[in-house]
A protein has these predicted regions:
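Conserved active-site and cofactor/substrate-binding residues in soluble primary-metabolism enzymes
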Residues: 47, 58, 62, 92, ...
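Acyltransferase
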Residues: 247-337, 341-348, 352-371, 379-386
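Alpha/beta catalytic cores of group-transfer enzymes, especially the acyltransferase/condensing modules
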Residues: 42-43, 137-311
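A short, flexible low-complexity segment enriched in Lys/Arg and Gly/Pro that occurs
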Residues: 11-22, 99-103, 311-318
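A generic secondary-structure signal
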Residues: 107-111, 240, 324, 328
Length: 386
């Protein structure tokens, strides 16, 4: 009689994860009831660590010390003491936001017994937030993710500096807001001006120098898109679509003074391609993570490495990601962790703050929000079971 095959618990867990990822790749619906999401650039604020350090020193103090040690400088002092002009620098703001978001998750896990692996079914993050999402889902180690976010931020800052120096223009991002029923037509008018082809890829416009290009950086919600590039060129685009396209969207300059998700960030894309080697990605992760570039879950380690790199220059399909989870994957509960409420507001635009039994949208940016949020999750999970 052949010897009985012994399978370790760890091996069983890995097999289960592969099955889950295979279900995604084949279009099966594993019902991703609870999503964990993280914010992107622009939500940083001076002093955002302080309330957490005061409320949960046993968890947050070691975490902050680890953050500073990994980076090799006192980012915590910049976050707490400023000046805000120093915190707003891309190379400081991005690791600060990412680390603060992960720290809040660690507080839930260590102080409140929150079992991320059991209670969260899928993660996602808006732009920069994708790095925290990949850490939470187990694809990237926190120290590695923090280091590359810092270095990527340095490269992005240098891209912006060179573009300004070469052109004498100001670069950044601008949100266009319209009525939901007008968004498709507005996007089509923008794409026509940007010389996009029918598949949504850049054609003849790619022959322009990067500093002369404007790109569609984000599809954020049912009534908002974001443009990236020089403000001079963005205003030319707005004038064109208002005069000839019949559209008059509300235009809002974003806090960023860099043209993220545009061709001038090509060096950041090149940097990410170099550092995202096969050994840095743990595959499969603990749960699926939705890609900004495709609006669908990463389906392989190679896909993750490629699209996390491309995210620096490609459109962030945030609205597509939310629609996929809401309409196809069965997501009912949405938990946002990190500074600010921008992420929650964008999610709520699509799915509503509450509604279906067992559903809701919550976010935690301050310690006082933890207990109420945990109660809401507990109650809706109980509702879903009944």
């Amino acid at each position: 009689m052949p010897p009985r095959l012994r399978v370790s618990a760890d091996c069983t867990s890995r097999i289960a994860r592969r099955i889950a990822h295979r279900a995604y790749a084949t279009g099966a619906d594993p019902t991703l009831r609870t999503a964990l999401f993280f914010p992107g650039h622009g939500v940083q604020r001076k002093g955002m660590l302080g309330p957490w350090l005061e409320a949960f020193p046993n968890t947050c103090k070691p975490f902050v010390e680890e953050m500073d040690s990994i980076l090799g400088y006192k980012l915590s002092e910049i976050i707490e003491d400023g000046p805000i002009s120093m915190l707003d620098k891309t190379q400081n703001a991005q690791p600060a936001i990412m680390a603060t978001s992960v720290m809040i998750l660690r507080v839930l896990e260590k102080e409140f017994g929150f079992d991320t692996d059991k209670r969260i079914n899928v993660t996602l993050g808006h732009s920069l937030g994708e790095y925290a999402a990949l850490v939470a889902a187990g694809y990237l180690d926190f120290p590695f993710a923090l280091k590359i976010v810092r270095r990527r931020g340095e490269v992005m800052a240098e891209c912006t500096r060179k573009a300004k120096e070469e052109s004498g223009e100001t670069f950044g991002m601008m949100a266009l807001v319209c009525e939901p029923e007008q968004l498709d037509a507005l996007t089509a008018a923008v794409n026509e001006w940007l010389e996009f082809n029918a598949e949504g890829t850049r054609d003849d416009s790619s022959s322009l120098p990067p500093i002369q290009q404007v790109t569609l950086a984000n599809k954020n919600s049912k009534n908002q898109i974001v443009l990236s590039g020089s403000f001079k060129r963005i205003r030319e685009l707005l004038t064109h679509i208002r005069e000839f396209g019949g559209h008059d969207p509300r235009a809002v300059e974003l806090k960023s003074r860099s043209a993220f998700h545009s061709p001038i960030m090509r060096p950041a894309f090149d940097y990410m391609k170099r550092v995202m080697t096969p050994e840095v990605v743990r595959w499969p992760g603990k749960m699926p993570t939705v890609s900004n570039v495709t609006g669908m879950p990463f389906d392989s380690a190679d896909n993750l490495r490629k699209n996390l790199s491309r995210q620096a220059i490609d459109t962030v399909l945030w609205w597509d990601s939310i629609k996929y989870l809401h309409e196809q994957a069965g997501t009912k509960r949405w938990l946002g962790l990190g500074p600010g409420k921008v992420g929650r507001n964008l999610v709520s635009k699509e799915v509503g703050r509450s509604g279906a039994k067992g559903g809701g949208v919550w976010s935690i940016s301050e310690p006082r929000e933890v207990e109420e949020t945990m109660r809401g999750l507990d109650e809706t999970e109980a509702e879903a079971r009944n």
